[in-house]
């Protein structure tokens, strides 16, 4: 029998997504109304009314491809985060951003650093490009940034840091994150995955997007799937300097955001 695909792809264990409520109801013979879905950290309040109105207005144009460059969304994000629009890359959810980063910056055999007990997609994205994962043991189920910095090797091209961490919920303060960024070599890209940033208490929040001005190797990744209740739309974005966004946009699929 023929064997298709490279070995590193065949070795990937597919991501186990949370089951839809309808599937759980069929599998266990339950009433959908009695099921509460917690598996994927979706917003329990659902889609905001303002978003429903905007989607209804846009429905008439569903026969056409969306704006491939996302002009209006980038303009709004540019104003919100006080960065130029060409510093923004749009993704099909922030999951897309994580994978784009791996494809843009990691060649087969090169290494990627991330923490034990962090988001499963970091390992999948690394395997998908034939990269070598350096998994740094967690401390109290969170990132050990000192150990992660020390684990960077000559062939390391990418580091993933989830803050707050998914799935353990641990959090790293601004001073510790910035101290870590100062230790990372300039040729190693750091993805700061902030999918759950909006859930932080106000006293713990900080505007990491402004660090991008200081660190040319930093990507700040955000999503509309969690706090904004738009998981089904698949919209995420990254903020980085133009030298980084240029490469990410070469890899990004056209029309990747609805």
Predicted feature locations:
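PLP-dependent aminotransferase-like
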Residues: 104-161
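N-terminal small-domain helix-loop-helix segment of the aminotransferase-like
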Residues: 1-93, 100
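Structural scaffold positions in well-ordered secondary structure
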Residues: 38, 159, 193-195, 221, ...
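Short glycine-rich anion-binding loops that position phosphate/pyrophosphate groups of nucleotides
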Residues: 41-44, 94-95, 119, 163-167, ...
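Short acidic capping loops at alpha-helix termini that bridge into adjacent secondary structure
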Residues: 33-34, 84-88, 108-111, 155, ...
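Active-site pre-lysine segment of PLP-dependent enzymes
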Residues: 127, 145-155, 167-190, 194-225
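Short hydrophobic alpha-helical segments of the AMP-binding
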Residues: 77, 122, 126, 184
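PLP-dependent aminotransferase class I/II
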Residues: 48, 69, 217-258
